[in-house]
Amino acid sequence: MSSVGNTRRARGGCTRHAFGGFIFLDASKDAGVAYRYIPPGMSKVPSHKLTALSRLIGGTPLLEIHCRYRGREQRIYAKHEAYNFTGSIKDRMALYILQRAYLNGEIAPGDVIAEATSGNTGISFAAIGRALGHPVRIYMPDWMSRERVLVIQSLGAAVIPVSAELGGFLGSIRMADEFARDSGRVFRPQQFDNAANVQAHYETTGPEITAQLATLERVPSAFVAGVGTGGTVMGLARHLRERFGDVAAHPLEPANSPTLRTGHKVGRHRIQGISDEFVPSIVKLGELGRILDIWDGDAIVMSQRLASELGIAVGISSGANLLGALEIAHEQGNEACVVTVFCDDNKKYLSTDLCSDEECKEHYLCNQVELLDFRVIQPCASGYATRT
């Protein structure tokens, strides 16, 4: 690794390193944020575009949500990922995978990007892929929200809907693989199997959270996240384990569709983006804390209340994540510092039950939640490139 470059302190005590190539903040045992050098001689990499995109991804605010839960005041810390380029946490993974693919010579300008997704990943690859000049094809189950399809199409990507009869999510993956096999010059990100998905959150999301909490002189006591690909929860699990030892990262899934517990598709649910019919290969349950279960209706009501009571407009999985985090914080007591993610905002769910009247059933956890206030902990620096 080259040692030639400029180094300066960033906001919140983070160090930023400027080199001739890209500058990344990375996880380190000795400091909350360190660097990793990406040489400028990537495989015909459109470096100016990647640099520009990297400035739009990561470095998101951390929200401190002040609640009363089961009669006890709690503060939950939520990374507000709607501030990314396309408005979701998936931008982190998409940019990281494409940067690494260029570095390893796995993709070249003009190659087609083909991916299977429930929506947010497709939006991220459509936007970032088109910005880099790639044709993009997105395969997705045909029951995802209409907004997702329209956004992807507006970004110049082709959307191939896959019915339940054609295999749904697993059928989407199969069809993307078949297209890549039968066509020339196709790059498959393979988000469910790609270790770079985990690495993206290990190198960016985790260190950002650690640095932001450090400004409050706090360290995380647990992490909670719904599992779609599993990249977020696995990346944070690794980061927390290396930095703080015995700090659990808890995977979360819909109580009415417990894929992680059963190992296969079971039941139906309305939390788009998690529990996608199978357990991804990058998910290692033995490295995670216990699985948390949240009813989809409970998550919907909680997301609705975050918007209507605090003005924080988030997607359905964010409501589930908040409820799961509150459960863990309640178990840990007054010293808990539980972190989660608000993966996106509510704009891609306007045609779903998120914008319908949802019955708040007696057994729902949201009945135990009183939302009091929130404050914003600004990021110290993005986990992606910050200077050139």
Give the residues covered by each predicted segment.
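Serine residues within intrinsically disordered or low-complexity segments
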Residues: 2-3, 28
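PLP-dependent amino-acid enzyme catalytic core
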Residues: 22-388
